[in-house]
């Protein structure tokens, strides 16, 4: 046991060194640029902009350390350090966005220090730095992925399942064959003794959506025998995780407040929605004009598409989107867009792929029908259909609907509604202003991921499809 813990700590230390290395290299590259270009007061062409950069040694270090801290913040939020946990391409997206965001923040800071907005035109050195850092990031990802594969070979796992088919879960695990290998599956019908004996033969176990009584027995057995265990959470588990711990004499208690956001949280969230909505409308106006022109030129139909959706407490409202389907696409009734939906126009495919079809919802945010972050709004009839299979689906209506959300960032467009509900409840139960800001940053990242914009599986019929 002692050796196992020491070995695990050694692995984590190696990965930590890799994290420190990439931050140090990126910071050193910026320091070279700072000393040799921006802080060089002898550059005659730039003297009038750099005459304010008279720093002593501590001043230089302040700029460089601040750069490192901002870089760490973006890398941490966007997942730039998560080699092995995320796919290589996801880590690369995160690194690119982190580097570009950090350099943009630093460049704005330099412009403020210089007290000259014309300074913003001298961007080529920082752009060059960004390109070099991206190249270094690619090399780092390849090297760290190789090291990770040696330190953490794929787990051979036992999967325990019940009435719900394990095929979808196995399919997801197989997509990360570098981390997980389901070597054996066993049904609850095999009996408790047989399953416990099989668990003892593995280093890792994954427990599917099975009754709580049996699941708890497996969890206790794994805990007692130091066996790594993964468990598909139930809706009640998500509530338990977010509960507050209180001590009443010698008896620990969990407190479930179940009251939604506090007044302070609601006020801050609304203020942030208004600020981001105003900035977003102004910044996105050229793009929205181009999209409107493209839609109009394609078939001459209406540019916008409005539809009734429901938000907090089931209140109906009109949501606005750029029209991505043919005119009268729902004359045969409401249905979700499928992966190969023939109703989607060529222009619609492009704007859906880029997630810009939802830009008009910035006005819904300003009006107050929606928030910038929250569960995506559904139609009343779709919600009722899901509630037949999942009575708890209405739990999503405890907060305002959102333009982006936890389920959009961590799920996929074709994630089954039951799993989307779990993701949305994770957001609702763990809400904070910091979580909102994190999800907004991560939304920028998913704009470039195809699986986030595909339709539902053509064969999906129910909210619990798992075959």
Regions from the language model: what does each represent?
Residues 1-149:
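Signature of alpha-helical transmembrane segments in polytopic membrane proteins
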Residues 1-29, 142-285, 454-455, 459-467:
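N-terminal hydrophobic signal-anchor/signal peptide
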Residues 4-5, 394-467:
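C-terminal terminal-structure detector
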Residues 95, 99, 154-169, 302-325:
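Membrane-cytosol interface motif
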Residues 95-99, 103, 271-279, 354:
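Loop-to-transmembrane-helix entry motif
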Residues 236-237, 305-343, 404-422:
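Short, glycine-rich, amphipathic interfacial segments at transmembrane boundaries or analogous
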Residues 265-328, 364, 439-467:
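A hydrophobic, helix-centered structural microdomain
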Residues 339-400, 439-443:
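A short, structured surface patch at a secondary-structure boundary
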């Amino acid at each position: 046991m002692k050796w196992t813990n020491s070995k695990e700590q050694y692995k984590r230390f190696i990965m930590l060194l890799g994290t420190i290395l990439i931050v140090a290299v990126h910071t050193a590259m910026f320091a070279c640029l700072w000393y040799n270009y921006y802080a060089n007061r002898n550059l005659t062409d730039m003297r009038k902009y750099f005459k304010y950069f008279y720093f002593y040694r501590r001043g230089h270090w302040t700029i460089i350390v601040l750069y490192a801290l901002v870089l760490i913040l973006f890398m941490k939020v966007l997942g730039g350090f998560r080699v092995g946990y995320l796919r290589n391409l996801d880590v690369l997206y995160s690194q690119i966005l982190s580097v570009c965001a950090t350099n943009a923040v630093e460049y704005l800071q330099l412009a403020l220090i210089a007290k000259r907005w014309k300074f913003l035109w001298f961007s080529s050195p920082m752009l060059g730095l960004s390109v070099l850092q991206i190249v270094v990031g690619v090399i780092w990802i390849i090297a760290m992925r190789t090291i990770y594969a040696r330190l953490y070979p794929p787990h051979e796992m036992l999967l325990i399942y019940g009435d719900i088919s394990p095929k979808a879960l196995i399919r997801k695990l197989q997509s990360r064959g570098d981390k997980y290998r389901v070597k054996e599956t066993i049904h609850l019908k095999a009996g408790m003794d047989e399953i416990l004996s099989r668990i003892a033969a593995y280093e890792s176990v994954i427990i599917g959506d099975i009754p709580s009584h049996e699941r708890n027995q497996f969890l206790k057995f794994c805990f007692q025998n130091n066996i790594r265990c993964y468990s598909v959470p139930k809706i009640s588990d998500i509530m338990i995780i977010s509960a507050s711990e209180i001590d009443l004499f010698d008896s620990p208690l969990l407190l479930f407040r179940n009251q939604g956001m506090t007044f302070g949280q609601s006020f801050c969230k609304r203020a942030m929605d208004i600020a981001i909505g105003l900035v977003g409308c102004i910044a996105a106006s050229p793009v929205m004009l181009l999209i409107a022109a493209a839609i109009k030129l394609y078939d001459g139909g209406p540019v916008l598409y409005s539809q009734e959706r429901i938000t907090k407490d089931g209140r109906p409202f009109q949501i606005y989107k750029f029209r991505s389907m043919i005119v009268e696409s729902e004359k045969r009734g409401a249905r979700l867009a499928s992966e190969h939906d023939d109703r989607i126009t060529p222009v619609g495919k492009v704007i859906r792929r880029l997630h810009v079809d939802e830009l008009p919802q910035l006005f819904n945010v300003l009006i107050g029908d929606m928030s910038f972050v929250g569960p995506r709004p559904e139609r009343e009839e779709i919600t009722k259909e899901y509630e037949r299979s999942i009575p708890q689906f209405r739990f999503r209506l405890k907060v305002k609907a959102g333009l982006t959300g936890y389920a959009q960032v961590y799920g996929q467009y074709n994630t089954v509604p039951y799993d989307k509900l779990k993701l949305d409840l994770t957001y609702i139960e763990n809400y904070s202003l910091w979580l909102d800001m994190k999800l907004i940053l991560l939304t920028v990242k998913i704009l470039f991921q195809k699986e986030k914009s595909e339709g539902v599986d053509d064969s999906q019929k129910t909210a619990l499809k798992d075959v």
